[in-house]
Amino acid sequence: MRRPAAPRAADVAAPARHRLALPALCIAALIAQIDTAIVNLATEPIGTAFGTRVGALQWAIDAYNLAYAVLLLTGGLIGDLYGRRRAFVLGATVLSGASVVCALAPTLGVLIAGRALAGAGAALLIPASLAIVRVLWRHPAERARALGIWAACGGIAMIVGPTLGGVLIHALGWRSIFGVVIPFGIAAIALTSAVVPESADPRGRRFDPAAQVLGAIAIGCVVFATIDARHDPQRAALLIGTGAAAIALFVRIERRLGTAALVPLDLFANRAFRGMLVGNGAMTFGGYGMLFVLPLAWQSHHVLDASGASLALLPMSVPFALVSFGSGAVAARVGARTAGAGGVALMGLGLAAIGIGAAGSTNPHAPMLAWAEAGLALTGTGLGLAVGSLAATAVGAVDAARAGTAASLMNVTRMIGAVFGVALLGALYDACGGGASGLRVAMLTGSALQLAGAALAWRTASTGTRAGAPRPIG
């Protein structure tokens, strides 16, 4: 009868350790989101400093997103094989070091390389932090609460990042924004090393280098083709063909490896899971594309400077942070499928409003930002509703044993959507002259694709259930 005493003592001690571990894990969400959001406001001064065009500037954002998306599954596998705390610390170290490279970059090429290195660090950091949450918080309700706090930090970063970035750019120049990550990274490394226990689960797992290389080639070719299509259509067509061939080989290898694959293909037989992927891609496609194009339009037409643009983005950031906390209750009432797809649809309506008011966002003599601010508020509300609801669908649509893989694929899809959003909407803005017409075409195109994605996600997930349990998703 005395055997249970030790577990009870450990259970008493565990919450204290968890309370110390959660801030370290939340810092990971903060620095990854800040490192993404803060750069959007710096595109115009970076372009001025290096004398470059929009197409090249897109790589300052896409290099991070692309490296993150391509390496995310490998980052999660490294944590499973060699230790999640070790992967977390390594990711924070790489991300902090990359920030130093970006801050000191003498050329745009070095800056882009530093951004890619930062994306690689985030690809280690984020899946490791999610896996640590799953290991430390074993009770579903407690784990859900911890993940909710973890996710809310992304909303806080969306408020702090642009505002802080605008202030720093105005006071100290664009290089200063990359220094923000460094102290947070050091704090995360120190706190995680002190309070987070090591864990690993290497059973039945191994690297899939061929699939990883093919995936990188496929994504890289298609994204580069999207950015470069206007300037060299023949090369863009060749890149798209190469990417398609890489995708075909990737699928063939993964099908042969079965459950040992980098991406087990049988996951995609689950309709709810497929719908979640569509919703996540549509969500970040429009959101990240808009956050690249709109601040660039404001600043390049001298409607707002960097600090003014950061304040003008608050109508998006504040609703996102506030709605995120209540998205679980909304999803419980109407279903995660409806809440997630509805949030993406709201974002699409927000982009449409920004497109309608494009003339006021690009006229320095008579600026009128009411349409843009209303659109940003809709976008932020939809984003806050969609993020948590789509994540809940990811966890609920598959067996618990595959929840980690599902979460990694969810983040891959988000970042791929972001890459294509920045590439395509930025290319449309540039191709249409970069003025009011460019902003209007980019935003209305993004709106149409988001609304279509929301409808497709809702329809695809309509009959989805968790594998092995006939449970409706929404």
Predicted stretch roles:
Residues 18-34, 39-41, 234-237, 246, ...:
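12-transmembrane solute porter fold
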Residues 60-63, 90-91, 113-114, 126, ...:
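Hydrophobic core positions of alpha-helical segments in small-molecule transporters
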Residues 2-194, 352-355, 372, 380, ...:
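Transmembrane-helix bundle of Major Facilitator Superfamily
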